[in-house]
Amino acid sequence: MGQKVNPTGFRLGIIRDWASRWYDDSPVISEKIKQDHVIRTYVLARLKKERAGIARIIIERTTKHVKINIYAARPGAVVGRKGEEINNLSQELSRITGKEVKIDVVEVVKPEIEAQLIGDNIAYQLENRVSFRRAMKQAIQQAMRSGAEGVRIRCGGRLGGAEIARSEQYKEGKIPLHTIRANVDYASVTAHTIAGTIGIKVWVYKGEVLVQRIDAIEEDELKRIKERRNDAGARNRDSRTKRRHRTKR
């Protein structure tokens, strides 16, 4: 199952948090979800030319304002000179949302082990006619040197302008997809080349996290199972004693 499911969704609520951190039970919740998608698409498209290296965008909502946390490899490209770029971006997003927008830019310390940035970098190289094998191998080497415990990259499409589409992948280290406590970063990116689109999938294993929390959850679950078994055993004993009394009568 771990080989098929999205690694990020598989770990949500355990070791990974949601990208939209707000709650609403009103009928307009679908409009807010759609608005989050529009915000992310707009921010990525606007900062693509600057090559800011956007790893992820976290959106938080309150009744009065919308807070957007942008994780970027080059935060200076997002902020701009004297903060002009970020001020213009917040004003444009305020017109989209109809609320006050607050933007915080967080620097990504190790962009070499961020799956989204690795995929974007490979896509950029493929669109500029760099060999896909060279781009994949260089990305894996840089990630392993930067502290990743395992990397896997797969490219699929008309690789090298071939007539027949195929997929190739390179892997180094280990990628434990079935282990929920394993911090596996995943990204899927599309490169638009002259020959057609090429799909890029990236898995980066960064080690295990929150072992104590998972052990506590497992202990609680074991206690519940034991309590259920004890309750079931007590009910069975009561039913057997009642049957014996009936037979004696």
Curated annotation (Swiss-Prot):
Comp. bias regions, Basic residues: 240-249
InterPro entries for this protein: KH_dom, KH_dom-like_a/b, KH_dom_type_2, KH_sf_prok-type, Ribosomal_S3_C_sf, Ribosomal_uS3_bac-typ, Ribosomal_uS3_C, Ribosomal_uS3_CS
Keyword S-adenosyl-L-methionine assigned: no
Any single GO CC term annotated in Swiss-Prot or TrEMBL for this entry: cytosolic small ribosomal subunit
Keyword annotations of the record: Ribonucleoprotein, Ribosomal protein, RNA-binding, rRNA-binding
Subunit: Part of the 30S ribosomal subunit. Forms a tight complex with proteins S10 and S14.
Free-text function comment from the UniProt entry: Binds the lower part of the 30S subunit head. Binds mRNA in the 70S ribosome, positioning it for translation.
Protein known as: Small ribosomal subunit protein uS3
Source organism of this protein record: Pelodictyon phaeoclathratiforme (strain DSM 5477 / BU-1)
